[in-house]
Curated annotation (Swiss-Prot):
Function: Splits dipeptides with a prolyl residue in the C-terminal position.
Binding annotation for Mn(2+) 2: 246, 257, 423
GO MF: aminopeptidase activity; metal ion binding; metalloexopeptidase activity; phosphoric triester hydrolase activity; proline dipeptidase activity
Cofactor dependence: Mn(2+)
Protein name: Xaa-Pro dipeptidase
Keywords, comma-separated and alphabetical: Dipeptidase, Hydrolase, Manganese, Metal-binding, Metalloprotease, Protease
Residues noted as binding Mn(2+) 1 in the record, renumbered to the chain: 257, 339, 384, 423
EC top class, as a word: hydrolase
Length: 443
């Protein structure tokens, strides 16, 4: 494989091309991209954990340093002002020398408010992208050039198409996350609490809680019915029934987002349902290809859910087609089949149909689907179907004409297991689909 430095060089060529195009379209001279600033907790003197501007880390793998600035015009070498204060209170990152620094002009910025003296005098035609518009106004950036929607829409749209460098980083993030999942399963099998399982995961991936791309979902038993469960009980339950882990990792600013579900026992209905969801997820991925709308795959999985509900006699005396048509599958899989993945976990532009930002909303029947784009080569997405037993979603079905089709006794028996989710990260190619997760032998 090409070195990361060679891949990065081509990555910058691609970003420069996109920059030239967007500057010409919106008649701008350059973009000033801000890494971000630290924000203190209200009435306190310590800051929230720093989260870098995604548009900044698209250019440089600098994810932990606030008060950095990047000036790009699509022609000249991108220029990075790297915040390098004299500070004995806090650690200071050294001026970077890495695989990527040959392609970027790196200049030390000793004072956070010192960027004004470094920029071109004429700034009326520079666009600012960042989280501190008041800072841009202080730098005499025109108000209408602060986070201009058209520019951001354009950049977001093309972020769906990953460069080879980005794909290489995402494969590395997968490796880290997979090692974490193995460690977490081992911790679960040994009877640990959610809190301790999370520590095992973080240790294996080399992350802190603030480093992971999203809060880890470490859910034992009925907690697996809470889609974004992040509480982390310190005490292990008296009986281990099930474990749902939705946890990722980050490499050079790019995310992995994986989910696995395990049954404590292998000889019950729940264990068989986990196996069947896994099999159907793999079967769906095998059908994926460029040129098909992501919405179609979401709808197809509801048909697969119907098949499983019927097989396991959770819904009875109703055809699979009627189940989907009347949305009896809805309470069992209330979220979308997945989402775009990249610099952000829920990566941008999932609904954009073109580089002008034309929006196509999710179908009204499936409002929580996060992507309506037609799949194209170089797109990276998650495929994460699930079946859950969530009382608040099932309750409305306990009355009315369809209630008789629900096997309430079976549902009550499965509720203590919470639910099931299986999530892989896939790359669309010209000639098929790459499953980055399964390629690393994560069962």
């Amino acid at each position: 494989m090409e070195s990361l430095a060679a891949l990065y060089k081509n990555h910058i060529v691609t970003l420069q091309e996109r920059t030239r195009d967007v500057l010409a379209r919106f008649k701008l001279d350059a973009l000033l991209i801000h890494s971000g600033e630290l924000f203190n907790v209200f009435l306190d003197d310590h800051p929230y954990p720093f989260k870098v501007n995604p548009q900044f880390k698209a250019w440089v793998p600098v994810t932990q340093v606030p008060n950095c600035w990047l000036l790009v015009d699509g022609v000249n070498k991108p220029k990075l002002w790297f915040y390098l204060p004299v500070d004995y209170w806090h650690n200071v990152e050294p001026l970077p020398t890495s695989f990527w620094t040959e392609e970027i002009e790196v200049v030390a910025l000793p004072k956070a408010d010192g960027i004004g003296s470094q920029l071109p005098v004429a700034r009326g035609n520079i666009g600012y992208i960042g989280s501190a518009p008041e800072r841009a106004l202080q730098l005499d950036i025109a108000a209408n050039n602060i986070n201009p929607k058209g520019v951001i829409d354009y950049l977001h749209y093309y972020r769906a198409y990953k460069t080879d460098y980005e794909l290489a980083c995402m494969r590395e993030a997968q490796k880290m996350a997979v090692s974490g999942h193995h460690a977490a399963e081992e911790a679960f099998r040994s009877g640990m609490s959610e809190f301790d399982i999370n520590l095992a995961y973080l240790t294996a991936t080399g992350h802190r809680d603030t480093d992971v791309p999203y809060s880890n979902i470490v859910a034992l038993n009925e907690h697996a019915a809470v889609l974004h469960y992040t509480k982390l009980d310190h005490q292990a339950p008296s009986e281990m029934r099930s474990f749902l882990l939705d946890a990722g990792a980050e490499y050079n600013g790019y995310a992995a987002d994986l989910t696995r579900t395990w049954s404590a026992k292998n000889d019950n209905d729940y264990a068989q349902l986990v196996k069947d969801v896994n099999d159907e997820q793999l079967a769906l991925i095998a059908t994926m290809k460029a040129g098909i709308s992501y919405v179609d795959y979401h709808i197809q999985f509801h048909q697969r859910i119907a098949k499983l509900l019927r097989k396991h006699q959770i819904i009875t005396d109703m055809s699979e087609e009627a189940m989907v048509e009347n949305d009896l599958t809805g309470p069992f899989m209330p979220h979308g089949i997945g989402h775009p993945l990249g610099l952000q976990v829920h990566d941008v532009a999932g609904f954009m149909q073109d580089d002008s930002g034309t929006h196509l909303a999710a179908p009204s029947k499936y409002p929580y689907l996060r992507c309506t784009r037609v799949l194209q080569p170089r797109m990276v997405l998650t495929i994460e179907p699930g079946i859950y037993f969530i009382e608040s979603l099932l309750a409305p079905w306990r009355e009315g004409p369809f209630s008789k089709h629900f096997n309430w006794q079976k549902i009550e028996a499965l509720k203590p297991f919470g639910g099931i989710r299986i999530e892989d990260n896939v790359v669309i190619h010209e000639n098929g689909v790459e499953n980055m997760t399964r390629d690393l032998k994560l069962a």
